[in-house]
């Protein structure tokens, strides 16, 4: 957060954001910079713009949020550093990104923890989310109450369909560079390979790996249906975005402005969740029309395998008893 008199000197020559709050009759007293890594067309940016417009209106033009989408301000690591230093006010990292700073933030990505969105929001709008927000606050960041949706991850393969845990044995599958993801697939007896996303298509094409896992919109955009035959609706990991603010900047806002900003951002986050649900339904139909076959999976077989392998017990110890008990209170017994 900066006052206009400070910002004017600091931003001469900087790239202008593609979107921001609407023009108001007078100059804003408070300017807030928000960076993210998604394109303008993504529901996160559409709803963020709505929140920015609402905030400008409800503060009578006192507050302007400038939105810098699509990695304009750098990658996730860069923006996480900037929001910590106060270079930007807001950032929306995925839980797995902020977990590099706050490890317990990755707890929502425990494999096969959630049976569906009802359990996700019960946990993340409830005690699990509150626990993570407290941990985020300890590193001088403020996390808004409502988490934004990044979707469930699904598995695709070029060979036989994945229907139960036994189908994972020996499967060469690309996974992101995440200790939690790597550990889960190893526990399922697969052979996970950590590759940059830019390498996924060619690696599938050349059979370096036979499978991969991502949310459906990513599978669509990357045209992975061209090199994969089937998609298992596994919902094996859910990830979301935390809308976070620099702690000092947030505390420096007048109380009335805090109230308006928090309400607008939380309401926008809830609306974005429904957008993602509708988007996934549309994307699945499109992928099916392009020849990607979909099949259901047996989640109980995966949970049993992870339990028997000691995966859940190991991560219970890593996350700590308090956080794990809160998770199991929302989803049932895992370890």
Question: Residue spans of the language-model regions?
Answer:
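N-terminal secretory/targeting leader peptides
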Residues: 2-19, 24-119, 127-335
């Amino acid at each position: 957060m900066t006052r206009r008199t400070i910002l004017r000197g600091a931003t001469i020559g900087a790239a202008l954001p593609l979107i921001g709050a609407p023009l108001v009759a007078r100059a804003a007293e408070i300017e807030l910079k928000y960076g993210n890594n998604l394109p303008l067309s993504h529901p996160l940016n559409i709803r963020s713009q709505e929140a920015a417009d609402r905030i400008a209106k409800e503060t009578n033009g006192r507050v302007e949020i400038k939105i810098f989408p699509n990695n304009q301000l750098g990658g996730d690591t860069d923006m996480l550093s900037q929001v910590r230093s106060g270079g930007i006010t807001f950032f929306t990292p995925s839980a797995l990104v902020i977990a590099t700073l706050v490890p317990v933030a990755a707890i929502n990505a425990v494999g096969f923890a959630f049976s569906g969105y009802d359990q996700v929001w019960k946990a993340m709008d409830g005690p699990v989310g509150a626990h993570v927000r407290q941990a985020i606050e300890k590193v001088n960041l403020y996390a808004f109450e409502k988490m934004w949706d990044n979707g469930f991850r699904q598995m695709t393969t070029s060979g036989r369909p994945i229907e139960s845990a036994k189908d994972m044995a020996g499967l060469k599958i690309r996974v992101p560079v995440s200790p939690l993801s790597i550990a889960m697939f190893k526990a399922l007896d697969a052979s996970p390979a950590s590759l940059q996303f830019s390498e996924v298509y060619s690696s599938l094409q050349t059979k370096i790996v036979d499978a991969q896992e991502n949310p459906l919109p990513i599978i669509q955009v990357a045209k992975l249906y061209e090199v994969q035959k089937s998609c298992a609706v596994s919902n094996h990991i859910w990830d979301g975005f935390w809308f976070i603010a620099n702690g000092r900047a947030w505390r420096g806002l007048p109380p009335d402005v805090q109230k308006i900003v928090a309400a607008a951002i939380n309401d926008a986050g809830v609306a974005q969740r429904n957008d993602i649900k509708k988007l996934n339904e549309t994307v699945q139909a499109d992928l099916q029309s392009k020849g990607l076959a979909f099949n259901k999976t047996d989640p109980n077989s995966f949970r049993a395998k992870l339990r028997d392998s000691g995966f859940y017990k190991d991560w219970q110890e890593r996350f700590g008893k308090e956080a794990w008990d809160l998770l199991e209170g929302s989803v049932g017994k895992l370890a």
